[in-house]
Every structure is written in structure tokens, then in C-alpha cells.
Amino acid sequence: MYVKKRDGRQERVQFDKITARVSRLCYGLDMNHVDPVAITQKVISGVYGGVTTAQLDDLAAETAAYMTVTHPDYAILAARIAVSNLHKQTKKQWSLVISELYNYVNPRTGKHSPMIAKDVYECVMRHKDEFDSAIVYDRDFNYQYFGFKTLERSYLLKLDGQIAERPQHMIMRVAVGIWGDDVERVIETYNLMSLKTFTHASPTLFNAGTPQPQLSSCFLVDMKEDSIEGIYDTLKTCAMISKMAGGIGLNIHRIRATGSYIAGTNGTSNGIVPMLRVFNNTARYVDQGGNKRPGAFAIYLEPWHADVFEFLDLRKNHGKEEVRARDLFLALWIPDLFMKRVEQNGQWTLMCPHECPGLADVYGDEFEALYEKYEKEGKGRKTVKAQKLWYAILEAQTETGNPFMLYKDACNRKSNQKNLGTIRSSNLCTEIIEYSAPDEVAVCNLASLALSAFIDYENASYDFKKLHEVTQVVVRNLNKIIDINHYPVKEAHNSNMRHRPIGVGVQGLADAFLALRMPFDSDAASKLNIQIFETIYHAALTASCQLAKEQGPYATYEGSPVSQGILQYDMWNVTPTNLWDWTALKADIKKYGVRNSLLLAPMPTASTSQILGNNECFEPYTSNIYQRRVLAGEFQVVNPWLLRDLVEMGLWSDAMKNRIIAEGGSIQNIQSIPNDIKALYKTVWEISQRTIVKMAADRGAFIDQSQSLNIHMREPTMGKITSMHFAGWKMGLKTGMYYLRTQAAAQPIQFTVDQEALRATDDRVAPAHSGLKKRSPPAGTYTSIVLRENTSGPRPYAQTGVSGTSTPIGTRDVPTPASTPPPTEVPETLVQSDNRPRPLVSPAKSAGFKADLPEPESPKALATDPIVKTEDIGSPLLERKEGQNEDVDEDSQERDENIYSNAPLSEQQVAACAWNPGADPSSCEMCSG
């Protein structure tokens, strides 16, 4: 049997040659568990006459990827085979690739169609020797397979459908696209990105260096006017933004409600639903940058709007199609007054913004005074029980995961842009809180820090110094993007130049905890969570202050809280730790100002975290075993940290894999796994949601925008969701909830799981082991990042006289802080029955949180509601095909009763909980369950 080589020659298939090729790519991997011969055997079984060497490489990579469930190093080996294959099909010299991309001629039109901007091409030609020599192609071999396939699918530039770039080419294109002729900055950015310490957001990776470099991720749009002209002008704005790969947050608070008078035509309004269906179709039609991602609009509405009930039904799977808009994402912009009325079981008046103007333009006490004035004047459309509307919100969230929940007053009170006016919405992913207006489209450029890259494995500590320095580089990059960005609409350009907000996020917080052997819900993790975000906020302000010293503060700086010496943690009434010298930083800000109005905005990082091989943003792992889908098929992936631990303890086998699958990705009920390992690998479904919300509030004091906080509930009920929302609101969160994530009520039958093997794993007992060991760095991890030494810059801000951590990074013009101590002391030990010391892996469990406790009722039934017995529909009714009337008769289910009135006294406390961190949660039904 023959194989066809890339030059067209044919050669007999040789088993040893394939094995040798795979073996050459196994450097640095654990050869006790990685078997090149096993891969070759499976590849040979799939060989056919005339197969090409490229196809053999694809088959070998897919084979290694399928073996990832055996050991995580197979994911790196699979990527190396795929990368090696790509390297054979692409040019090595980056300047030649750029020349080819710039000189591209469209074969259909015969016209010059450059894929690289002229100024970028000319810059590369001027500095090609420096840029070409700076690229380290070996770094391509440290991606995991699924991260590399993500790059292949959407990020690497293609010529006539064939990939022309390598991953290192893309990173250098991004660096040059941002910094141009500043060679030192280019190489600094290239090195930090290629070493996987941070990544820019997807639009930046897509478009940097191209003829239309639209590098921004988020756009916040305000309706231009409540008129046909205003609505369709806004629609065009949304289409232009979506065309350029931007996600959109649109507020419609000021669009008149159904039945409102229209003076121009002497008619009445159809309300917001028909209008939103037009926006829905635009989102479907105008995708983000040539099918890279679908168009995405989030629609924000305040809950006093008279069409709010119809709004909540837009994404439901049942009901009339003409009143549905399932491609839009829904969000509520909730004033505190509404939460108070729900808590008190009070009345809530629905109003039309045309008849009760100004409500969207004020917040806090001013909003409450105006709203109550309209109530007293009888201008409302309809008065309902606040809990009736609350029930409708929870019902929609249970069915669809929407609407998102953001608290208007917290967003405005704790914003550094409060001097600009009332903020009316967030963005698509609920982490951007910026001022928008009819003549201003708010914009945000994003990047995320890979928190797992700053682990000092040698000392089992966290390297805050390195994190501080890299954060400053990220801030400078994002600030530069504001100036070189191609804006889809002039309103976005005007806004970004005036206020200069940026969004620094994170990914891999869960990986950082696992690398340091900290359970997600431990005291040590809670402390590290605060210190990480305190470090990022301090570093971001440091860099922005230095930029202001060089270039001046942003145009609307005067009158902002920061200009008055008020930082984000001051607005939360929080005192920072002694990790950094905030007094000196405030003194410098008072002297020079800051260049950017907003700095931190932890975003979801869905795609970029997959590229870098991290868990998403600040979330726990959702499962310890899951599916990854690529064009080649579906692959099972096991949490790589868990897999290494189980392999080292001799517990990993097919039977163990099947047991974890049978447990839905959990290891908590597997007797053979030690308890400290179980504590380390709790999934998000097994961690108290109170812990998740509390950690969000802890880091919130150092996040001047907001955060994309998902809520996970295994079996959601109205009582649980109510508990969660009120806890977040009381703790001062800006984003109370991004998505509500739930699990299916029933698991599918697992035909592929061997039940006999499961019983075998049940019979095994946990092996004796001496507690959690210090984790060594995984394959493909860069443990030492050394750039040029810092030669200039302002004095360090960190407190001096403390012990150091790991290898420093010297970066140009970045203030290098003094070394900082590790985040936590060595854990206290407990003595087990056999006198062996064992680390304390989690604190004592506090009183249960209602949202974490199982409840037997239907997800649509409140915890205090009686369970209603339902009857089967008789066959005559089915034969007559009678439809439901729920969309015709608005009053078919009034739900006007007090949803807690018939409950025992303890259960009536659910909606009236005054939960706060100092209170005893066990005294409250909402918190204790």
C-alpha cells in the first residue's frame, strides 16, 4: 500500500516511519502514559491506497485527540501533529506570508483584494528582519488540540479557503496591528501573547492588521428617538456594528407601549414586540464578520414598562410565532424600588414612557420620587402585585435562561462615568457598564489575563508581581487600540475618544486554584480571589495613570469619582488588603489623572479560553468530563487536573471514566477517590451558590465595570431563584445574573456505560495517600517568562520589605512593583486517625443556602405554593386540535395572590430577607432553606 507525499511522489507505507514521526513530537510529555506505537497502530488500520501524508497527519491527530481521556498529554500531542501538518502547508517566514496576504488577487474578479492593511504591510517590510527573527515557532506546539482547531476554524487568515497563517503569525499580526513601527512594543506584546499570559478578544484576533481593523467587542446603543426615523436609524447602527463582529446591548426603555397615541398619524402604537421582531431578523441576517459568529443583540428594558409581560415571553418555545423573537437576548435593568416592592409584597405600576417621561433618565432617590409622583397622579397603565411580575420573570428564566438581571441603581451609583449622565444598559454579556446616548454609542475593547500563567510552581504560590506587570502591558495595548480602531459608526468613535474605557478580564481562575491545590470554596481560594482582582485593579490604574502623565487624562475626566479620589472599592465601602500601596497610587492619580474612565470587566471568554486551554473566566468547572465538538467529530475530554491526579494515584481506568460519566461528570459519590481530591474537584453544581455570589461580591470591589456572572442550579424552583437574586442584590452586585444555567430533570440512558464495571469501581476503596501534593506544571506550561529588564519608569507602588515570589518580568516603561508575598500561608494540618498530617481542604460548612438545597416541587412552582394535580387531556380535545389561549387571554392566569401568604410564618420570610454578610443566615428561610 502506498502513501502520496506532498511533492506528488508515492512511497510505501512504513509503520516505523509513522511511529518515529509521532515520537519526535512527544518531547516533554509523560512517556509513561503516552504511547506513540498505539497511535500508529490505529492510524495504519485506517490507511487506504493513495492516502496523502497530510491526511495521515490528520488521522494521527484525531487518534491522539480521542486518547485524551487516557492522559491529558495526548491533547498536546494531537495539537503538535496537527500543527506540524499546518507548518508543512504554510510558509515559515512571516514577512513572506504578509506579502502574500497583501498581494492577494481575487480569482473571481481579478482585482487586488488585500487581506492586510497597506500601512501594516509597509511596516512589516520596513522591519521584516526584526519581526521574522522574533517569532518562536516552537510555541505553536504548546497548544492543546481543541484550542488549535478553534484557531484553524475562525482565527487564522485563509487564502482561497486554505489556511495561510500559523498561530505565531496571527499573534505577530495582532502585535504589529496594534503597535506598528514601535518594534519594542510589538515584540513585548508578541512574547506575552505567545507565552499564553494573556490574549486579546476575538474581534482583535480576527481583524488586527486587516484593511478594516474593527477590534472592539462590545457596543452599547441607545434608541435614537421614539419614532419611525429613530427606530430605523438605530436598526442601521446595529446592522453596521454586527457586520463588523460587534456584540450589541440596546436599551428600549423609552419606546412607547402598546396602545399609546401617535400624534403624527392619529393612530396607536403596536408596542415593542413588532419592533423587536425586526431587530431579531436583522440579528439573523447580519452575522458578525462573514459567518465567524452569528449576530447578537441583547435588549434591555426596565420593569415598569407597560409591555414588560410580553417582553418576558419573547424567547419562549410555545405560543404564537408572531409574538416571539427567539434570536434576541433579553435583559432587565432593575431599579431598587422594584426589588423593595417584591420584598414587601407591594403593588407595582406599569407605565408608558410616552405618558410618564423621564424614568429611564434618573436613578436612585430621584427615580423613586418621579415614579411615585406618576403613581399618585394616576398616570400608570396598570397596577399589579410586584410578585406577579416577579413570578413571570422567574418563569421566563426557568424556561429560557433569560432575562439577564442587572441592578440599575448599583450600576449607576458605583460607576466612574456617573458624571456623564444616567447609564441605561449593559452589553451583550452583562460585564460592560458604560454611558450611552442617542449621539453616543459606548464601546469597549477587551482582553483577558490567563490567571493560570502566573503560578509559581516551585514555591507553590501566586506571582502577583508578574501579574501586575503583564496587566500594565494589557492596559497599554487596549488604550492604543482606542486610537487605531476602525469604528463602524461615528457615534462609537466620538464616545470612545471622549471617555476611553477598556475592559481587562480574566480566564482560568479555577485552573489557578487547582494548580495551587485550593478547593474553589475554601478560605484560601476566597482570599486569592480578592488578591488577584485587587492586583489587576491596582496595576490597571497604575498603567492608566502613567499614560495620563504622558498623554493627559481622558476628555471627560473632571467631575468623575476618580478625579475626586474615589476608587471602586471606596464606592463599595471596602478596605483593600495591604498587598499594594494604594495611598501612593491615589496621590499620583490626583497629580496626573487617569487615561481611561473604566478598566476592569471580566467577560465570559468562551472562545479565547478554549484557545489557551483554560477554564472560562472566573467560573468553576461545570463537569469533570465533557464533549468537545470539532469538524472531525466529538471527543471526550476529562478535566486535565483531575486526570493527572487519578493517573498518579493509580485510579484511572476505563471503569473510572465510565463511572464519572454515569455520575454526570461528578466524582463526589465515587468511594475509591479520597475526600481531599473530591473537595478539590467539586463542579459548579456541587459548590454552594452562596459561595459563588459571595466571591463575585468580594472581587466586585475591584471591578469598575461589572462581571458576567452565571448562576447554576441543578433543580431550579421559584424559591431558590428568588433567594439567589435577593442575595446578589443585597450584596451590591451590579450584574445579578447573566444566564441561569440548569440541568435536565432526567438524565438520558447511558447505553455506552458498562454497569458491571461501575459496580467494580464501587467496590474499591480509596488508597492511602498523604494528602494533596504540590502540583508540578502541566506539559506546555511556560514556568519562566523573562523579557528585557526595566530600565526606567516611575517608582514601584507595592509595599517594600516583603519576601519575593518567582521570576520577574522586566517590561518597558512598566512600573515594576516590589515583590509580594504568596497569597496564603501553608494550610493548617489536621491529624488523621493514623497520625498522618492532612491539609485542611475546605472550611466548616455554614448553614445551608436555600438556593443550594434540593426541593421536590416542579421548577415552575414556588416553594410555598400548593402542588396542583394536573389531568391528562382527553382524546376528543386532541382530535379537535384546540389550541391554548394563553397568548389571547392575558388574564388567564392572574397570579395576583401573595405567593407567600399561605405559607407558614418561617416561609413568609423568603421575600423579606434582609440578608447581609453580618447576619445569621440560618434565621432566614431565603438563606437557610
UniProtKB/Swiss-Prot annotation:
Residues 868-884 have a biased composition (Basic and acidic residues). One of its GO terms (cellular component) is ribonucleoside-diphosphate reductase complex. Disulfide bonds join C218-C444. Its EC number is 1.17.4.1. It comes from Neurospora crassa (strain ATCC 24698 / 74-OR23-1A / CBS 708.71 / DSM 1257 / FGSC 987). GDP binds at S202, S217, N427, E431, T605, A606, S607, T608. The record marks C218, C444 as: Important for hydrogen atom transfer. Changing V124I: In un-24; temperature-sensitive mutant. This is Ribonucleoside-diphosphate reductase large chain. Residues 1-92 form the ATP-cone domain.
